[in-house]
């Protein structure tokens, strides 16, 4: 029986091996492993992709989010005890970044048709302590609507994007600055380049993207021990830098983003065409949005575990995203 892996990182990286090796040879020849030309290039290309003014490469997606909230605290935009609205269905990293900075996560429910944050539910959670709403573009689907802009303007809250799963996606609705690309819709966005992502590193890597110059400067300093210049530490910072090896991998893969996305769309179209079982709820697709299919998520409301067992017996791996949501994790009960 043929076995179908949920994901093969070896197969995912095979098309780019020669380019990656050539880039790594440049790094070995240069002897420059941090703050080099590949990280600088990656930052420029990410900012351009999102139609944003600034990008800061960093160590991973969680640190990208942590740096965003830490920067807002250092800038006086937020203070300990302030609230951040987060979707109830997301990876725990989205919430860890909030609590790590002394902020309070407030969980809002999702829209079952999109699996993303329900902005009507989010509005009901807003209080005088609310300083931000986190939108997570889950599974590669843009989490955006005119309501996001309305809430930001009406309540004066920041919109923080968790764009870990949706690089290259875009919304049919314009963002706060008139752009449509995820990562440039809100005030600031965090990216993850964990190996399983659409654009994945050979280890951990992340980035922060924003058009707010002051915020970008604070994030950059905080990621480098809090230093704005060498041996001049304006913050009690962290060590959250991206090394040149990971930056080089990401530069290579980012150059292939369009073909990677097209391939994912083609596979999603096959699923759409051939999944006809009425007990399986397929993803809702908005034709005006650009969905990048980080995952092809389905719901089997009545017989999920039985369905997974059936798939496993036929050699097909599946997973649950997420088996235990953050608000039910022991650390957040």
Residue ranges and their predicted role:
Residues 10, 39-44, 49-55, 120, ...:
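PLP-dependent aminotransferase class I/II
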Residues 113-201, 207-209:
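Active-site phosphate-binding strand-loop segment of PLP-dependent enzymes
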Residues 89-95:
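Conserved coil-to-alpha-helix start sites within the AMP-binding
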Residues 32-83, 97-109:
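Phosphate-binding glycine-rich loop
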Residues 1-32:
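N-terminal "arm"/small-domain region of PLP-dependent enzymes with the aminotransferase-like
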């Amino acid at each position: 029986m043929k076995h179908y892996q949920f994901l093969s990182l070896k197969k995912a990286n095979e098309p780019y091996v020669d380019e990656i090796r050539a880039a790594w040879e440049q790094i070995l020849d240069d002897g420059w492993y941090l703050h080099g030309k590949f990280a600088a290039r990656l930052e420029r290309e990410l900012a351009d992709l999102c139609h944003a003014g600034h990008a800061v490469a960093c160590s991973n997606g969680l640190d990208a989010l942590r740096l965003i909230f830490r920067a807002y605290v250092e800038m006086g935009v937020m203070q300990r005890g302030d609230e951040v609205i987060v979707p109830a269905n997301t990876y725990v990293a989205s919430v860890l970044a909030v609590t790590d900075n002394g902020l309070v996560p407030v969980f809002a429910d999702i829209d079952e048709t999109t699996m993303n944050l329900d902005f009507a539910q989010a509005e009901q959670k807003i209080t005088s302590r609310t300083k931000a709403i986190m939108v997570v573009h889950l599974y590669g689907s843009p989490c955006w609507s005119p309501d996001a802009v309305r809430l930001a303007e009406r309540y004066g809250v920041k919109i923080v994007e968790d764009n870990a799963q949706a690089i290259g996606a875009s919304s049919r609705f314009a963002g706060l600055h008139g752009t449509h690309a995820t990562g440039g819709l809100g005030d600031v966005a965090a990216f993850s380049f964990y190996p399983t992502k659409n654009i994945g590193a050979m280890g951990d890597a992340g980035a922060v993207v924003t058009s707010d110059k002051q915020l970008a400067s604070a994030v950059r300093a905080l990621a480098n021990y809090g230093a704005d210049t060498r041996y001049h530490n304006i913050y009690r910072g962290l060590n959250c830098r991206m090394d040149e090896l990971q930056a080089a991998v990401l530069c290579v893969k980012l150059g292939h983003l369009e073909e990677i996305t097209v391939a994912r769309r083609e596979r999603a179209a096959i699923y759409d065409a051939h999944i006809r079982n009425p007990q399986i709820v397929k993803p809702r697709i908005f034709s005006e949005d650009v969905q990048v299919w980080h995952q092809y998520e389905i719901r089997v409301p009545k017989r999920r575990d039985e369905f997974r067992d059936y798939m496993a017996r036929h050699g097909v791996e599946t997973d649950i995203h997420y088996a235990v949501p953050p608000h039910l994790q022991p650390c957040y009960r």
